[in-house]
């Protein structure tokens, strides 16, 4: 998926030898909706930009969301200092995946602290990709105009189109 950077790979089970199969365990996708500030977390994978690294820290906020093309996702900020090239999974103390490390959403002063997209938000995307289904594509980046924003900016409440991707169905339909 181009928006999230998630790729689902599959390998036929009959091509995996028994020794390797015994080393494989399933990553349990947890519920990230109840994650709060102060929750302990592990960043595993390559949070330092190199494979097989693990870092520990705390969730510093779960109150942010990001707008991407055709989706909005809740993100966690952490106090885990990693690499701007870092990636991997954010794991809770029960060993469950609660987020996928993403880049580009840290605040200006915290460029190397890790952020992660909430796994609960990504489960539908993972399920669609796992079932070899296409992710619907419209080509819009939108934001919600709340009552407060509408009053402050003297604009109607609803949805505001921030960006229309070139050559997208949204552009073909004439949306601006």
Residue spans for each PLM region:
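C-terminal cap/linker of serine protease catalytic domains
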Residues: 97-156
């Amino acid at each position: 998926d181009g928006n999230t950077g998630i790729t689902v790979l599959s390998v036929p089970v009959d091509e995996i030898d028994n020794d390797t199969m015994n080393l494989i365990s399933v990553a349990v996708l947890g519920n990230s909706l109840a994650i709060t500030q102060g929750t302990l977390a592990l960043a595993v994978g390559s949070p330092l930009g190199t494979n097989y690294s693990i870092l520990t820290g705390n969730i510093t906020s779960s109150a942010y969301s990001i707008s991407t093309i055709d989706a909005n996702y809740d993100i966690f900020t952490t106090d885990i200092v990693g690499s701007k090239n870092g990636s991997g999974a954010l794991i809770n103390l029960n060993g469950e995946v609660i987020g996928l490390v993403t880049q580009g959403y840290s605040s200006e002063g915290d460029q190397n602290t890790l952020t992660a997209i909430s796994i609960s938000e990504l489960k539908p995307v993972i399920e669609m990709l796992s079932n070899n289904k296409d992710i619907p594509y419209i080509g819009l980046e939108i934001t919600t105009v709340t009552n407060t924003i509408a009053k402050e900016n003297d604009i109607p409440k609803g949805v505001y189109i921030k960006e229309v991707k070139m050559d997208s169905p949204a552009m073909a339909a004439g949306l601006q």
